[in-house]
């Protein structure tokens, strides 16, 4: 993409929109298993099954559809494609608010995943407009914005759910996503990659190209495993905490939101400091240390027998995750030609 002289403005705008979009997309995590009880899923085992299915289908479909949308963003411009994503998130949030069965919620979340891919497109925009020497720092900013959405989403969603009922967070998330869409349309400039109108490769050809790069394969694998570990407990976390508390608390969604908030806050702070740390420590060494650290904190989470011990070590895990993602993304960006960064 063209190196715009106003690249800082684009970076800050993308980060701000990512925070809002992240809250809108992740805000349901703190109360989703509890909401299922309101639409007829009463058994704990059945609620856990549906929570895992509904929570997992969206990122799964995003993983399948993201390469297609990234290539479309490269050809047609990221502004148009991100607008489609935000419009879909807005509509689906409102549809979930009036859903009456777990199957309806499942289908809506599946459709959201099909038009997903906001984060990789945002990453490609940041990597493309940032000067080479600023890439690590700006990707750290975007990672912090992404984590902030993950951090505030469940907290806000949990608070709204515990005070206004389990349907109102969907409405809140829909309105917030609509605001992000309006800001994107008003303030985001059109960005086109030089030569984008030339020879075009298919999605499969692009995937084969990146899969042939060993560093890209390694970094994608590390990101997948770390995200799998940190989010694997997400769908059942409210039920797990409810069991820890003996089912006696009326603010379970808020407690879940606080725990996720603490983990996200630690991750965001570390992401913001990535640029300063990588100026003193090599990227591979920092990535190795962070992954080992995260592995140890996962073991400590398993050993906890109370809610706040679990919350503490999930927050500590966020420290390592805050370094892993921007460092891995920087290494990926360095491994591909500049003209390919808008796709990878």
Protein language model regions, located:
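Juxtamembrane intracellular "pre-TM" segments in multi-pass secondary transporters
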Residues: 1-8, 190-221
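Short amphipathic helix-loop junctions that connect adjacent transmembrane helices
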Residues: 31-48, 236-254
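Central cavity-lining transmembrane alpha-helices of secondary-active solute carriers
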Residues: 53-69, 261-273
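Conserved MFS/SLC helix-loop-helix module at the cytosolic interface between two early adjacent transmembrane helices
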Residues: 64-100, 278
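Structural signature of the two symmetry-related core transmembrane helices
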Residues: 80-95, 174, 285-299
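Paired small-residue
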Residues: 103-111, 308-316
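Cytoplasmic helix-loop-helix junction between adjacent transmembrane helices
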Residues: 108-146
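Intracellular juxtamembrane helix-capping segments at the cytosolic ends
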Residues: 118-130, 323-336
